[in-house]
Amino acid sequence: MVPRGANVLWFRHGLRLHDNPALLAALEEKDQGIPLIPVFIFDGESAGTKSVGYNRMRFLLDSLQDLDEQLQSATEGRGRLFVFEGEPTLIFRRLHEQVRLHKICAELDCEPIWNERDESARLLCRELGIEYVEKVSHTLWDPRLVIETNGGIPPLTYQMFLHTVQIIGVPPRPAIDAHINDATFIQLAPELRQHLGCFDQVPNPEHFNIYSDNMGFLAKINWRGGETQALALLEERLKVERNAFERGYYLPNQANPNIQEAPKSMSAHLRFGCLSVRRFYWSVHDLFENVQLAACVRGVQIEGGAHITGQLIWREYFYTMSVNNPNYDRMEGNEICLTIPWAKPDENLLQRWRLGQTGFPLIDGAMRQLLAEGWLHHTLRNTVATFLTRGGLWQSWEPGLKHFLKYLLDADWSVCAGNWMWVSSSAFERLLDSSLVTCPVALAKRLDPEGVYIRRYVPELKNLPKEYIHEPWRLSAEQQVKFECLIGVHYPERIIDLSKAVKRNMMAMTALRNSLITPPPHCRPSNEEEVRQFFWLANY
C-alpha cells in the first residue's frame, strides 16, 4: 500500500517525454513521495487501433517500446511503461483499490471520437475522488479556445481561422523537459499485472491478430516509430529546411515533389505524438529567423516566411472543424459536408482500387505502396483520392477514408477526413468545383519519366520500356508477348474509360451546383491562393 496515493500518466497520443505537460503534472508531487505509474491501454480504439493494418500497429508498438526503454534507462530500471489490454475505467478502478490513485493525467484528445472514453474516465474520477488532469499538447492551439474566440462557432474559412488564432496569439513554446530520473515509480505485483491484463513486455502485432499482408515484399522503406527516432529525423529535416531557406524557397517537399526518394516527412511521428507539434513548429520558425538574420549580416535580404509552417496550420484548422462534429468522417449528419449523389458502392471497383488493380500504373503503384509501407507522397494521395471520387470512379470518399485510416501511418481522424472531403469537393473546396482533375497518366510521365517508381511497385510492368510503362494498354499483342505482360492476364485492363468518366463527373458536379439555389453552409477556401497552396496535409 502507498498511503499518499499514486499518479497515473495515461498515454494515448503524445507518445513522448519531451514537451509533455501531462507528464509534468503527474510529477508535481514527486517531492512529496507520490509515485508515478505510466500506462498505455489497448482498449480497442485508442491511438487509432479500432481498424489498423500491420504497419500502423507496428509503428505504434515501436513507439511504446521506445517509451519503455527511455523510462528504464533514465531511472536505472526503476521505471517502466505498463501496457494493458482492457477497459480503462476497470483498470483504473482496480489500480485505485490497490494503490489509491491521486491523479490521472493525460494529453487532451480533442476529437469527438474520444469523448465517450474520456467522459467515462472523468465520471470514474469524480466517483472515486481522483483528480483528472488533461493538458493540451497535441495541437498548437486548444481547438475549444479557437471556437470560443470565434463567437462559439467554428470558422468556416481558413482566413477566418487565421484571424481567430491571431487574436489568441502565437502558439505556446514547448514545455520544459521533465526530470524523471529522481522520480518514484510503482512496481506492480505480478499477480496484479496478470489480473489487470498487463503485458510483461510490449506485444507484437500478431498478438492482436494483425499480420503483414502479401504486399510486404514491395516495401522499400521500413518506417519505425518512437520518440528517439522522431528527434533524430527532426534534425535531418531541419538540415533540409535550412538548405531551402538559404536558397530562398519554402516547403521544399512541395516545390520539388519527388515520389522516388526517401521521404523526410515528420507526419507519422506527429500523428502518434512521438514528436511534439510545438517542437516542430518552433524549430522551423527559429531556424528561419536564424537564417534570415545571418543573411542580413551578409547584406542579403530573405523575404517571406509566412507559409513555412502552413501545413501545420491547416492541420489545426481541420482539428478545430472536427472537435464538435461527431459525424465529421461521413456525409450523413455532417453539417459541413455537401451531400454529393455518388454512385452506389461498387465493391468490385473499391476492391480493385484498394489492391492496386485498376489498370492505371500510377494508381496501382501508389495503392500497393500504401499497403506495403503505410506511406504515400502527398501528390499520390491527391491522385488516388481524386481517382476514387470526382476524377474517376465516382465512388464516395467514405470508403477511401476508412482504407487510409487503416493503412496510412500518419492518418488521423480529423486531418485525414478533412483531406478526403477537400479532394472530393465535398468541403474545404470551391463549391462543387471539379475543374482541377489530376490525370494519372500525365502526372506519371512528369514525376516518373523513366518508370523507376512503377517498376518498383508494379513489377508486372518491369520489362516495359519507358514509352509504354505508363500506358501499357498501348502495347500491341506482339509487344505484350515480347515483354511478358499480357493485358488482362498479367496486368489488368483499365477499370474505366478515364476521359469519358471525367467528363461525365464534371457534368454531374455542374448540374448539382446549379440545382443548389441556396448553397448550404460550406467550408471553403478564402481565396485562390489557398487553393494553389493546398496539398494533401501529410508531408509536414
UniProtKB/Swiss-Prot annotation:
Q: Which Pfam families match?
A: DNA_photolyase, FAD_binding_7
Superkingdom per UniProt: Eukaryota
GO BP term, example: circadian regulation of gene expression
Subcellular locations according to the entry: Cytoplasm; Cytoplasm, Perinuclear region; Nucleus
* Binding-site residues, FAD: 237, 265, 267, 311, 378, 410-412, 416
Q: Where is the Photolyase/cryptochrome alpha/beta domain?
A: 5-140
Keyword Cytoplasm listed: yes
Sorted alphabetically, the Gene Ontology cellular component annotations on this record are: cytoplasm; nucleus; perinuclear region of cytoplasm
Details of cofactor binding: Binds 1 FAD per subunit.
Alphabetically sorted, this entry's keywords are: Biological rhythms, Chromophore, Cytoplasm, FAD, Flavoprotein, Nucleotide-binding, Nucleus, Photoreceptor protein, Receptor, Repressor, Sensory transduction, Transcription, Transcription regulation
The record's GO molecular-function terms, alphabetically, read: blue light photoreceptor activity; DNA binding; FAD binding; flavin adenine dinucleotide binding
Which metal ions or organic cofactors does this protein require, according to UniProt?
FAD
Q: Which InterPro entries does the entry mention?
A: Crypto/Photolyase_FAD-like_sf (IPR036134), Crypto/Photolyase_N_sf (IPR036155), Cryptochr/Photolyase_FAD-bd (IPR005101), Cryptochrome/DNA_photolyase_1 (IPR002081), DNA_photolyase_N (IPR006050), Rossmann-like_a/b/a_fold (IPR014729)
The record describes its quaternary structure and partners as: Interacts with tim and per; promoted by light conditions.
What this protein is reported to do is described as: Blue light-dependent regulator that is the input of the circadian feedback loop. Has no photolyase activity for cyclobutane pyrimidine dimers or 6-4 photoproducts. Regulation of expression by light suggests a role in photoreception for locomotor activity rhythms. Light induces the degradation of cry, likely due to conformational change in the photoreceptor leading to targeting to the proteasome. Under circadian regulation, expression is influenced by the clock pacemaker genes period, timeless, Clock and cycle. Binding to tim irreversibly commits tim to proteasomal degradation.
**Member of which family?**
Belongs to the DNA photolyase class-1 family.
**Domain comment quoted from the record:** FAD-binding region regulates cry stability, cry-tim interaction, and circadian photosensitivity. Photolyase/cryptochrome alpha/beta domain is sufficient for light detection and phototransduction.
Q: Indicate what this protein is called per its UniProt record.
A: Cryptochrome-1
- The UniProt gene name for this protein comes to cry
